[in-house]
A protein has these predicted regions:
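S-adenosylmethionine
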Residues: 1-260
Length: 260
């Protein structure tokens, strides 16, 4: 893969200490790939039986419908994918919806939703009851989001194309559950998307942190009292994770961190 940015490596070395070498070694290990069966289209047991005819599947332990598959399976090329039988999604990305754990009948917001992996997973948990609002600020990515929602056969989802501030005007204290999978500097994507290496800089980390805090502020106004807001990123930077959450909590003492 493309050489990792030196400033990024220096930051990671300082942050990880003795675990730094293991972190570097992880870039040479095979990528873990997964898919999530869509029980909105067919009974899970039947879907699993069908998919095992074509793919080598091993269960992802933290989600009901998630499976690892082997690289040479190429499930994205199979007609079952186009039919919406499953969604190709990294196993780690399946964790957020599992932690948010919406219940059938609840109102749920995925604020930064494209391309739709987490949204379609949240919708499956609603079991056709309640409503899911899947929002994406970028028009081109919003079209992809809409296509995936349609492909997965989700009937109780509304796709919106707004910034978080605009959306918050329409849904004050409305949602039981909100997912903010925030735009970030993408440090966790370097191995998957090598172009992200060239786009990274310490300045981008700072900029992303400011934007994430703004998104969280707007999300807070859309959450019902007693609701649950889950914040996630695909980056390692403390400025975009721990520090963002810390600043948010300082401004919102009515919120507290839930242990998972």
């Amino acid at each position: 893969m493309e050489k990792l940015p030196e400033l990024f490596l220096s930051r990671m070395r300082e942050m990880l200490g003795e675990e730094y070498q293991a972190f570097l070694d992880s870039y040479d290990s095979p990528r873990v790939q997964g898919l999530r069966l869509n029980d909105q289209k067919q009974d899970k047991e039947m879907l699993e039986k069908i998919c095992r005819r074509y793919f080598h599947l091993d269960k992802v332990p933290w989600t009901e419908n998630g499976y690892y598959y082997e690289a040479n399976d190429r499930p994205g090329k199979h007609p079952l994918h186009e039919a919406g039988a499953y969604y190709i999604q990294e196993p780690s990305a399946m964790a957020a919806a599992c932690l948010l754990a919406p219940k059938p009948g609840q109102r749920v917001l995925d604020l930064c939703a494209a391309p739709g992996g987490k949204s379609t997973q949240l919708a499956a948990m609603l079991q056709g009851q309640g409503v899911l609002v899947s929002n994406e600020i970028h028009p081109a990515r919003c079209r992809i989001l809409s296509q995936n929602v349609e492909r997965m056969g989700i009937a109780n989802a509304l796709v919106t194309n707004m910034d978080s501030a605009g959306l918050s005007l329409h849904f004050p204290e409305y949602f039981h559950r909100i997912l903010v999978d925030a735009p970030c500097s993408g440090e966790g994507m370097f191995r998957k998307d090598e172009e992200a290496c060239g786009e990274w800089s310490p300045e981008k980390v700072v900029l992303c942190g400011r934007r994430q805090l703004e998104i969280l502020e707007n999300a807070a106004g859309m959450l019902r009292p007693g609701g649950l807001l889950l914040y996630s990123t695909c980056t390692f930077a403390p400025e975009e994770n721990e520090k963002t959450v810390e600043q948010f909590l300082q401004a919102h003492p009515e919120f507290s961190v839930e242990k998972t």
